[in-house]
Amino acid sequence: MRKRISTTSNQPSERTLQSELFGREVQFNYSETWLAYSMLGLRLVMAWVFLQAGLEKLLDGGIGDPLAWSSAGFLNNAVPEANPLHGVFLFFAEFGAIVDPLVIFGQILIGLALLFGAFFRFAALMGAIQMFFFWTAAWQAGVAAGLPVENGYVIDSSFVYMLLLFGLGAWGAGRLLGVDRYLEETELVKQNPSLRFLLG
């Protein structure tokens, strides 16, 4: 994919992005300022979504029982039998001792990473994978039925979150007032450019 960004002459705060999308040349103008604000805003919103979800699960049983929350009830009962992956989620339910901490602490760590813009692309990828599992668990039936979800077809909040995380990672939103901006200047990253794929 070819991408070129150039500054327009009459509006210094606007830029033009030219790229190729599905084999066609596309271009659009955007405001640098508003793009930065919107990326930062979306990043903080997604950080809150994950952090709140993880902390609610962690504190479900109170301070004295931090791992009282269990995914088993959801995996055993909430995934419809018509869901083509029903058996997969029943299998996961057998391993609550592994799945529960992964979900709880995964959500908290993803939320913190998004909040502080640290290892952003890695965190966004992990969050998108988690949202993918939540999305597939919401299927009421299979492809032949149109992939119905709770309030419609195909698209639900998990799907939207998954796409938002993909977009934020693609734009490198972790560099906006984030730790990744400084991590990229370290000697370790400069000597190992592949680490940049985890940052940004």
Features from the language model and the residues they span:
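Extended, low-polarity transmembrane helix blocks
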Residues: 1-79, 85-109, 116-200
